[in-house]
């Protein structure tokens, strides 16, 4: 049931602020680093670092993990690849923690962090391809979104 008209604007503003703040805390996948290293005429090593830039982890809650409803982060490499020597076209990297999961201790003018689940994950592929080949690396998870980068080998 709605509140009296005189208070409706206040209530809508509070609810909207909460919804926007909550949306900002959701997990957000990002591709931080990419590197291509040629090891031979048609052999390239492709590395990529995937991160969760959000506050919440990609699994959102421990309960989702317990119930088995949390989906892993998947990373794909597609494009003009002749073959994969190491790695596969689609890799599952599991969960990435968010900033909420970082163990931190505060002392006078000092912040230290302890062991915590990873916020980032680095993947490596060895691919057979031609120089100048175009590839697309995509990180995806239903709750954390999609991050895409295109590279020319």
Residue ranges of each PLM-predicted region?
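C-terminal accessory segments enriched in acidic
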Residues: 1-153
């Amino acid at each position: 049931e709605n509140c009296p008209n005189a208070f409706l604007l206040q209530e809508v503003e509070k609810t909207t602020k909460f919804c926007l703040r909550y949306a900002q805390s959701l997990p957000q996948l990002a591709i931080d680093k990419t590197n291509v290293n040629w090891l031979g005429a048609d052999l390239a090593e492709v590395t990529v670092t995937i991160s969760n830039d959000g506050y919440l982890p990609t699994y959102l809650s421990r309960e989702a993990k317990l119930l088995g409803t949390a989906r892993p982060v998947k990373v794909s490499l597609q494009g003009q690849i002749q073959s994969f020597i190491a790695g596969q076209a689609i890799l599952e990297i599991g969960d990435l923690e968010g900033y909420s999961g970082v163990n931190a201790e505060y002392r006078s003018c000092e912040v230290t962090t302890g062991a915590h689940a990873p916020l980032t994950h680095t993947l490596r592929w060895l691919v057979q391809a031609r120089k100048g080949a175009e590839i697309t690396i995509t990180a995806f998870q239903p709750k954390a979104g999609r991050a895409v980068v295109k590279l020319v080998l």
